[in-house]
Amino acid sequence: MSEPLPPRLQEIVDTFVDAPADLRLDVLLDYAKAFPKLPEAYVGRTDLERVEECQSPLFLATELDAEGRVHIVVDAPVEAPTTRGFASILFHGVDGETAETIVALPDDLPTRFGLMELVSPLRLRGFSALLGRVKRQVRELVA
């Protein structure tokens, strides 16, 4: 049995899995359109970590608030809808969760969306790398 996911993230996975295969890319594009706006405090900054494994430029930072909740900051060009879609999924699925919850996310998460036949292995590897970077940054925040 698969490891359980936080409720919002599970809901996103279910949306993909419940959609017919030929509509899953449309769902991914919907998430790309819902890509979070870069917070004003990050505009022009150059200290976001680049996720090199992504085919398109993707930059990442994580923050821990006073209540111990993690906030994810991502930036990617509008011309990179797949990359933006994957980053948006993580943002909408886990932003505001505890560090413990995020670090416990399963490494196989990118395979749970039913996209294996629809996007290239390189794109899925980028999603895996993004997840790995988020988890590593969060571990560093709480160390």
Predicted regions and their residues:
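Structural motif
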Residues: 18-21, 77-82, 122
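Alpha-helical support elements that line or immediately flank enzyme active sites
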Residues: 86-100
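Short connector loops at helix/strand junctions that flank enzyme active sites
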Residues: 53-57, 67-71, 84-86
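C-terminal binding/interaction regions
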Residues: 100, 105, 109-143
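Conserved interaction-surface patches within small, structured recognition/assembly domains
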Residues: 63-81, 91-95
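Generic structural signal for hydrophobic core residues of well-folded globular domains
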Residues: 32, 93-94, 134, 138
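Extended low-complexity intrinsically disordered regions
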Residues: 2-44
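Structured beta-strand/loop patches that form or line metal/cofactor-binding pockets in enzymes
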Residues: 41-64
